[in-house]
């Protein structure tokens, strides 16, 4: 009798007579009905490959359902609920009937050792499945899904892995070694995260579960409760370090109370050095307080001595950046700090006198003294009401060139500017003066007025400018050397420059005579407080440094 056929008179959709019957009906069952289950599958008339091969994929299991659970144990018929000996069968696509194996026949032989034996291992030695199940009831397992019974297909046959919340694989322990089922059940409850954080944060859900305890302890031990007891009081543990740590910090604060004043002083240092005029010496004090961190109080007494050198060192780093920046700010706008630095670069003895006195009185450079003796700068009487003459705006890239123009009484513009100035000078000849209104790009003020005294010599290069690209030179005579802010002249607009303010002019921009009179009047009558003379020694020092660099370049080129 073939294992794949039951009764030739039975229709395909007819139910099994013994499926829903009780155990007492087994007396009415004939012995021939059990032959397909007791005999081996020896007839090779199957039209589909044998399922005993563990490497073949299951073709038909998804179409078969299992309405009962094997969680009832032990398997005896005395007083136990009726257990069916025959299972339902699914109709195969080829028209033949295929009977799934029954859990009752766990011994070798029959269908138990052929169909799915190697793959599923449905028949373990111990039939007490109640000890392997989860904390849920048996009825919940059967009602959870169509595959919620113990005969669910393993993840390998379904082509996927166990997903969180998939209750159809609670009884996969049948096809796994002891302990593997509990491991998977424990992993289902776990969430994404490392082991330590999950064990602590999910104390009530993960650690207390039977599945995870069995996995961690090995043979169902209770060793997991040891680490569980620690995180249960983690609120108390968190409260302990949270409270004493702030207290320790607060205690350390007053101990190092002397170090608290320096941080605000640092801000005052930055602000005072650039914006304020007076607190420049005060700003230098905090620089030394943070550097030695050990004892700030005794150093405050010794600070007056080292207070002065730091501001002297700072201008050396700040001043070289001035000619490089297009938006340059005159150092004298910082007043005493840069006035002292200018004198200190050339003469260190002038530092002591620089603090109480004003910046102009500090300057005692011999070159500046000779210039003041030879020229009467900023005259009180000046004829600004010109009857004839021409006035031009001169825009300089750096104040270094202004310093050298005053020192050598020369100037040089661009090629286009030289031609314009030379033509204006030759056109005026002796009819009237040609005045030049000097301003440094980005300075925000005019720095002086000079008169053009000679035509442009195009074949001569002065070689004293901060950049070597300038060619040609002409003589000038400086009349006013003072800083006049742009806000004093911004109201004067030039009709020959799109009616723009005179302060918004380009190099060699000519100013109409009537507007030039207004500009000259304001500059002559303006009472200045700063000028390039305040930083004359500073620029002298920079010129010496540039000459050293220029000589080194020349020596390298010769080699």
Swiss-Prot record:
Bias (Low complexity): 279-305, 314-326
Keyword vocabulary terms for this entry: Acetylation, Cytoplasm, Immunity, Phosphoprotein, RNA-binding, Ubl conjugation
Amino acid composition bias (Basic and acidic residues), ranges on this chain: 24-33
Residue positions binding RNA: 395-397, 401, 411-412, 441, 465, 470
Residues recorded with modification Phosphoserine: 182
GO biological process: immune system process; learning; memory; mRNA destabilization; organelle assembly; positive regulation of translation; positive regulation of translational initiation; regulation of antigen processing and presentation
Domain remarks: The disordered regions have the ability to interact with each other and to 'phase separate' into liquid droplets within the cytosol following binding to mRNAs containing multiple m6A-modified residues. This leads to the partition of m6A-containing mRNAs into membraneless compartments, where mRNAs may be stored, degraded or used to transport mRNAs to dendritic arbors in neurons.
Family affiliation: Belongs to the YTHDF family. YTHDF1 subfamily.
GO-annotated cellular components: cytoplasm; cytoplasmic stress granule; P-body
Region (Disordered): 1-49, 239-365
Compositional bias of kind Polar residues: 343-361
Name of the protein described by the UniProt record: YTH domain-containing family protein 1
Pfam families in the record: YTH (PF04146)
Lineage, opening ranks: Eukaryota, Metazoa, Chordata, Craniata, Vertebrata
Span of domain YTH: 389-523
One GO MF term: N6-methyladenosine-containing RNA reader activity
PROSITE patterns: YTH (PS50882)
Modification N-acetylserine occurs at: 2
Tissue-by-tissue expression: In brain, preferentially expressed in the hippocampus.
Annotated InterPro entries: YTH_domain, YTH_prot
Subcellular location: Cytoplasm; Cytoplasm, P-body; Cytoplasm, Stress granule
Consequence of gene disruption: Mice are viable and were born at the expected Mendelian ratio. They however display learning and memory defects. Mice develop normally up to four months of age and have normal gross hippocampal histology. They however show learning and memory defects as well as impaired hippocampal synaptic transmission and long-term potentiation. Hippocampal CA1 neurons show reduced dendritic spine density but unaltered spine size. Conditional deletion in spinal commissural neurons results in pre-crossing axon guidance defects.
């Amino acid at each position: 009798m073939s294992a794949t056929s039951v009764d030739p008179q039975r229709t395909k959709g007819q139910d099994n007579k013994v499926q829903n019957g009780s155990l007492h009906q087994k007396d009415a069952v004939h012995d021939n009905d059990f032959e397909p289950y007791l005999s081996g599958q020896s007839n090779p008339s199957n039209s589909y490959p044998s399922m005993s091969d563990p490497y073949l994929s299951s073709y038909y299991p998804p179409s078969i359902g299992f309405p009962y659970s094997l969680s009832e144990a032990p398997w005896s018929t005395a007083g136990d609920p009726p257990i069916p000996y025959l299972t339902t069968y699914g109709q195969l696509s080829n028209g033949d009937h295929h009977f799934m194996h029954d859990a009752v026949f766990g011994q070798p032989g029959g269908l138990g050792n052929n169909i799915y034996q190697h793959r599923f291992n449905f028949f373990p030695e111990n039939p007490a499945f109640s000890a392997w199940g989860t904390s849920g009831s048996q009825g919940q397992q059967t009602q959870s899904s169509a595959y919620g019974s113990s005969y669910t297909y393993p993840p390998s046959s379904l082509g996927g892995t166990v997903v969180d919340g998939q209750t159809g694989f609670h009884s996969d322990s049948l096809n796994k070694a002891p302990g593997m089922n509990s491991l998977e059940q424990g992993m289902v409850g776990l969430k994404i995260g490392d082991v330590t954080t999950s064990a602590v944060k999910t104390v009530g859900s993960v650690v207390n579960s039977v599945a995870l305890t069995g996995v961690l302890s090995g043979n169902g031990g209770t060793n997991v409760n040891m680490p569980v007891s620690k995180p249960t009081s983690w609120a108390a543990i968190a409260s302990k370090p949270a409270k004493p740590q702030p207290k320790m910090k607060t205690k350390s604060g007053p101990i190092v109370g002397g170090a608290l004043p320096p941080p605000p002083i640092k801000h005052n240092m930055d602000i005072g050095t650039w914006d304020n005029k007076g607190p420049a010496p005060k700003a230098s004090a905090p620089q030394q307080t943070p550097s030695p961190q050990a004892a700030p109080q005794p150093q405050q007494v010794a600070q007056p001595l080292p207070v002065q050198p730091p501001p002297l060192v700072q201008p050396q780093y700040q001043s070289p950046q001035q000619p490089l920046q297009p938006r340059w700010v005159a150092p004298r706008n910082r007043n005493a700090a840069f006035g002292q630095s200018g004198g200190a670069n050339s003469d260190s003895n002038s530092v002591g006198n620089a603090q109480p006195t004003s910046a102009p009185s500090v300057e005692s450079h011999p070159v500046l003294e000779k210039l003041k003796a030879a020229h009467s700068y900023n005259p009180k009487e000046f004829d600004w009401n010109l009857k004839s003459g021409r006035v031009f705006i001169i825009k300089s890239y750096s104040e270094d060139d202004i310093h050298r123009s005053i020192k050598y009484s020369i100037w040089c513009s661009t090629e286009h500017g030289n031609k314009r100035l030379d033509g204006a000078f030759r056109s005026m000849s002796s009819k009237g003066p040609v005045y030049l209104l000097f301003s440094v790009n980005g300075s925000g003020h005019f720095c002086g007025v000079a008169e053009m005294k000679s035509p442009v010599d195009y074949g001569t290069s002065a070689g004293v400018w901060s950049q070597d690209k300038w060619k040609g030179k002409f003589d000038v005579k400086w009349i006013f050397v003072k800083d006049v802010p742009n806000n004093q002249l911004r109201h004067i607009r030039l009709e020959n420059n799109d009616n723009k303010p005179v302060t918004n002019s380009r190099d060699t921009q000519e100013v109409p005579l009537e507007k030039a009179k207004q500009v000259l009047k304001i500059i002559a009558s303006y009472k200045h407080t700063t000028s390039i003379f305040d930083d004359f020694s500073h620029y002298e020092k920079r010129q010496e440094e540039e000459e050293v660099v220029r000589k080194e370049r020349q020596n390298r080129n010769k080699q």
